[in-house]
A protein has these predicted regions:
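Cell-envelope/glycan interface and biosynthesis
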Residues: 1-158
Length: 158
């Protein structure tokens, strides 16, 4: 499989990979989604609009999201065998258990384990150190910049 990013995001992602390898040589980053054309964004939005899951997909009529600029990545960490580390939910799980804002509470309630929380924290540490920003509602999603900055400096992928 292939994933595409804007060169600025690809450079930052390589930095995140190197930071992870420096701490955990047997780990690697695993990419689930990267650049996404607006035509695909519209199809995704059509599936969730009018449902309780709409908040997890950027509305294309509002300019879409950072995936549509090649500046966002959905990512996790894999072990030496290529198996994703446990993070408490699957990627694209559209529920509060995916949010990063209340992870301590999720552990207390038994919705995720302490190890899953620590794995999420490790992912955030390497991604943030490389210049990415975490999305509060999705532990796997990272943006290179703000939406306003993307609109000013980059082009949408159609």
């Amino acid at each position: 499989k292939e994933a595409y990013l804007h060169p600025d995001a690809a450079k930052a992602l390589l930095e995140a990979h190197l930071l992870l390898k420096a701490q955990y040589p047997s780990y690697r980053l695993i990419i689930y989604d990267a650049a996404r054309p607006m035509s695909v964004q519209k199809k995704m939005w059509d599936v969730v609009k009018g449902t309780s899951k709409y908040m997890y997909v950027s509305n294309p009529s509002r300019g879409g999201g950072l995936h549509n600029y090649g500046l966002a990545v959905d990512i996790s960490i894999a072990d030496s065998l290529g198996h994703p580390l446990p993070m408490g939910t699957e990627v694209d799980y559209m529920d509060a258990a995916s949010h990063i804002t209340n992870e301590a509470k999720l552990v207390r309630e038994g919705k995720i384990t302490q190890q899953e929380r620590e794995n999420r924290i490790l992912l955030r540490q390497v991604m943030k150190s490389a210049g990415f920003r975490a999305l509060p509602s999705e532990w796997w999603h990272f943006n290179l910049c703000s939406r306003d900055e993307a609109k000013q400096k980059y082009k949408l992928i159609n």
